[in-house]
A protein has these predicted regions:
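Membrane-proximal intracellular helices of multi-pass ion channels
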Residues: 1-319
Length: 319
């Protein structure tokens, strides 16, 4: 309804009802598909800032995950019941889970940090076509949201500065949240890896956050996912550089591989020109990124028998 109302007076769009349904589903599912040839950068809707904020909201909600949204629903429902039914005595229950808190805080940091960085980096570049300050804020915000991992383009990414492209690669790599429609290594994985670094630097043997202790199994899994993703993407980049003509920019190839692994769909307009072997590399990268290399390895290598013994423990020198 909101998407339809934003384009109701736009004569350049023919089937407005279908446009609204298609883009709403595409945004919430983090698909990034558009029926317009230039996507949301099309001249017909390039400066429709109301539409862009609606699309951003749908992308974020889809990228948070159904369990996070349901957790907030439980919280709101409890507050409403307590507000209108004073006769019921409720015990203080921890409704918002630790997973929800980690996902929300990490998402906010990435969104706000991404907006500030891209607003400063692109202010005198791709944001110049937006005359108003509100337009520049909207464009910078959209560029911070869409790499994780919707894939809509509201600017020409080929004209972006190198620092901006590197930061977008970073956002694409992280992606959305667990049990969501987004790809990437996930916000909780990045958060746990970051928290573990600070815990090790502080001399702590465990991660404690918001009055809860995070299991070592979760931390190990997070680092495994992080390392496997970088190895997979690195192999994909090397493979593409072998198959592509000499002189192909490394940044362009890296951008395509990170986008493929996280199933983002953003491109520097290079994908249509890649060689046949490189297309298979990108296909494999997308498949592994969507399924998860760790999940594939667990499915192939995990044994059914359980070990009921332990070997002696010994420390290894690191750094």
């Amino acid at each position: 309804i909101f998407v339809y109302s934003s384009i109701m007076d736009n004569n350049a769009i023919d089937n407005k009802f279908f446009f609204a349904i298609f883009h709403s589903i595409s945004a919430f599912c983090n698909a990034g598909f558009s029926i317009l040839s230039a996507g949301l950068y099309d001249e017909a809707i390039r400066f429709d800032y109301f539409l862009q904020w609606i699309i951003m909201t749908l992308i974020v909600l889809g990228g948070l995950g159904h369990n996070i949204v349901f957790n907030f629903y439980q919280k709101i429902k409890t507050h409403v019941v307590e507000l209108f039914d004073k006769t019921i005595i409720h015990k203080k229950v921890r409704i918002i889970t630790l997973n929800t808190q980690i996902v929300i805080y990490t998402t906010l940091v990435l969104l706000i940090g991404g907006f500030i960085f891209l607003f400063i980096s692109e202010y005198n570049n791709t944001l110049l076509e937006h005359n108003s300050i509100f337009g520049k804020i909207t464009a910078a915000s959209f560029n911070s949201v869409t790499p994780r991992t919707a894939g809509f383009n509201a600017v020409d990414f080929t004209k972006m500065n190198v620092p901006s492209l590197l930061f977008i690669i970073f956002l694409m790599w992280i992606g959305g949240s667990p049990a969501s429609t987004a790809g990437g290594i996930k916000t909780s994985t990045f958060a746990l890896a970051t928290l573990n670094i600070f815990a090790v630097a502080s001399g702590k043997s465990r991660i404690q956050l918001f009055g809860r202790r995070i299991s070592s199994e979760s931390t190990s899994r997070a680092f495994a996912i992080l390392c496997i993703s970088l190895i997979t993407i690195g192999i994909s980049i090397v493979a593409m550089l072998i198959f592509e003509p000499k002189g192909t920019p490394l940044l362009t190839v890296a951008f395509e591989c990170f986008s493929a692994y996280s199933t983002v769909g953003l491109s520097l307009n290079y994908t249509p020109t890649v060689t046949e072997p490189s297309k298979y590399v990108l296909i494999a990268c997308m498949f592994i990124g969507r399924i998860g290399m760790l999940n594939l390895m667990v499915g192939l290598l995990r044994r059914l028998n359980h070990q009921f013994y332990e070997y002696p423990k010994e420390n290894i020198l690191i750094n």
